[in-house]
């Protein structure tokens, strides 16, 4: 009867020792295509224009038929979005984990996470749909999704 526990202990020890001796490879970031980089740059420039309250740049970047969905599930239109952007962005806003999903050669969804200190919800997952119109990227659709683990945060 003592052989089974002893054999189990030896197997576990050998497995752990083998696992520790394996060289670990650092996770290399996926290469970013020129298309993806263009959209990431476009998204960053758009956010910068909002932060710096460059209203003409923001107005030109939002499509005439823009629609959005807020964290409460309500739709908002271009005029409501532009009135919000004219307030600017908090200085300590943080955007991270930007990903681009190519739909066609002229459209893509840019997703990212955003932390907005002092806002409710503070932690959001954003999805912006961009389409080229006359050679320029235009924001066609935006959806805010609260991260559920932070939906009831209080500052």
Residue spans of the language-model regions?
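Bacterial N-terminal signal peptides
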Residues: 5-15
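Short, low-complexity N-terminal intrinsically disordered segments enriched in polar/charged residues
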Residues: 20-65, 103, 151-155
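Short solvent-exposed beta->alpha transition segments
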Residues: 56-94
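A mature extracytoplasmic/lumenal domain signature
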Residues: 62, 72-73, 97-99, 104, ...
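Surface-exposed, charged secondary-structure patches
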Residues: 82-123
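Short beta-strand edge/turn micro-motifs at domain boundaries
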Residues: 123-152
């Amino acid at each position: 009867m003592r052989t089974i526990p002893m054999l189990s202990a030896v197997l576990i020890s050998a497995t752990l020792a083998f696992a520790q001796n394996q060289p670990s490879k650092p996770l290399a970031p996926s290469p970013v295509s020129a298309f993806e980089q263009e959209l990431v740059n476009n998204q960053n420039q758009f956010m910068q224009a909002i932060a710096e309250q460059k209203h003409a740049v923001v107005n030109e970047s939002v499509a005439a038929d823009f629609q959005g969905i807020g964290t409460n599930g309500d739709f908002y239109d271009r005029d409501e979005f532009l009135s919000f952007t004219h307030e600017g962005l908090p200085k300590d806003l943080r955007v991270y984990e930007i990903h681009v999903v190519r739909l066609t050669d002229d459209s893509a969804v840019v997703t990212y996470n955003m932390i907005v200190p002092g806002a409710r919800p503070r932690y959001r997952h954003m999805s912006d749909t961009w389409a080229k119109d006359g050679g320029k990227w235009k924001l066609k659709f935006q959806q805010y999704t609260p991260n559920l683990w932070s939906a009831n945060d209080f500052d």
